[in-house]
Design a protein with these regions (language model features):
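Short Ser/Thr-interspersed hydrophobic loop/turn segments at strand-loop and sheet-helix junctions
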Residues: 54, 77-82, 171, 191-195, ...
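N-terminal glycine-rich flavin-associated loop
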Residues: 89-108, 132-135
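Flexible, small-/acidic-enriched active-site or ligand-binding loops
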Residues: 137, 194-224
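A short, charged helix-loop
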Residues: 214-241
Length: 387
């Protein structure tokens, strides 16, 4: 499918698109992506290649060790990664979130070069068992004892925790100011992974199998007193600047899955012959794919608008939430249509289609459930808060 955004791109953005496509064709061909998904393996060599070529440092200032650029550039790389291996696109988005959090805080700036180069990996530990989208219900505690924080609790659905050098942990360090301000008293801490008080287990999911999803148990884990990111008791404030970006880049993952699935289905229906010719000549096959292409193009424009709004410094909470909602719902419908066009062949282990179908499911409830996204959009329209 032709790229509807091609005519709107700056020259450097088109060059970036061609660069990441070339890198992936050489270092992450489809058969290797399939093996990584099947074997649930994080491809560290591909990750480091992305770092060597400046992809991991996008969105981080050059003077601090990054590659410059903004959300629009990060969205390009995210989308192209998701075309090939959506799991790695998830990890890429989390890498960018960590980088932006560090930069926004004005602290721990020495961590940026290693992150941008791919030599070091940092993970976010926010979600907890039973917490879901209700982040404020977390139970992990951090208590300051002398010159160290002592951390106890557990986290779930944490990408790349087993590969990480450092873990950014959201924990309660102080009591909330009131029952109506549960966000107060939460702090974000940088915690060294390799210590006796941290146990990490991989969690085998049917979706995003190569993303390295883990659970973490903290039992008297330690972090230095200087580990706070931002201000003590204002951990959500330290994260807030990344939320809109995360939603836009999550939408870009949906776009990448959609483009990959649609391109695969189009090739298949043009080559597969039945009843005297290619099955792509039948309207019953054409119309669902045409509808999918139209919806994907519309979602792409919304994602592009949200990304450029953030880069321009404009308020974009509504735009980013809408982009996440529309793109993820779009790809959910799209993979249903494209997989039906391919029939059983699309569900064969050797086909990328079955991977797109599985991975598209995550987009409906991650990084935030679409029902909550609808409530966020409704609140932005002036309706009463419902959560």
């Amino acid at each position: 499918m032709a790229d509807i955004l091609h005519a709107f791109r700056e020259d450097h953005e088109q060059a970036l698109t061609e660069s990441i496509q070339g890198l992936l064709s050489r270092h992450l061909p489809n058969d290797r992506a399939g093996e990584a998904d099947r074997d649930r393996v994080f491809l560290r060599d591909v990750w480091e290649t992305l770092g060597e070529n400046g992809m991991l440092g996008l969105g981080m200032p050059e003077e601090q060790g990054g590659s410059g650029g903004g959300v629009a550039e990060s969205a390009i790389v995210t989308r192209e990664l998701a075309r090939v291996l959506p799991s790695m696109a998830v990890d890429y988005v989390l890498c960018g979130m960590v980088g932006r959090t560090i930069i926004d805080s004005g602290q721990h700036q020495d961590l940026i070069p290693g992150l941008a180069s791919g030599e070091r990996i940092y993970s976010y530990a926010l979600s907890e068992p039973g917490g879901g989208s209700d982040l404020l219900s977390l139970r992990t505690q951090a208590k300051l004892e002398g010159d160290s924080w002592r951390i106890n609790g557990s986290k779930l659905w944490i990408s790349l925790a087993h590969e990480s050098d450092l873990i950014f942990v959201l924990a309660r360090t102080d009591e909330p100011e009131s029952s109506r301000s549960r966000a107060s008293g939460l702090s974000l801490l940088v915690v060294p992974k390799d210590q006796p008080g941290i146990q990490i287990n991989k969690v085998n999911l049917a979706i995003m199998r190569a993303a390295g999803t883990c659970e973490i148990f903290f039992t008297d884990a330690l972090a230095p007193a200087s580990a706070i990111v931002g201000e003590r008791g204002r951990g959500l404030h330290a994260l807030r600047g990344t939320l809109d970006v995360e939603r836009v880049l999550s939408a870009a993952i949906s776009l990448g899955i959609g483009h990959g699935a649609l391109d695969l289905a189009l090739r298949y229906v043009c080559e597969r012959e039945a009843f005297g010719g290619p099955i792509g000549r039948f309207q019953a096959v054409q119309h669902p794919l045409a509808e999918s292409a139209a919806e994907l193009a519309a979602a792409s424009l919304l994602v592009e608008h949200a990304a450029r709004s953030i880069d321009a410094g404009l308020p974009a909470s509504q735009e980013s939430a809408m982009a996440k909602l529309v793109a993820s719902e779009c790809v959910g419908r799209l993979v249903d249509r494209t997989s039906r066009a391919m029939g059983a062949m699309g569900m064969a282990e050797e086909s990328s289609m079955q991977r797109y179908v599985r991975d598209a499911r995550l987009q409906l409830f991650s990084p935030v459930n679409n029902d909550l996204v609808r409530s966020i959009i409704a609140q932005g329209l002036g309706l009463p808060r419902s959560y």
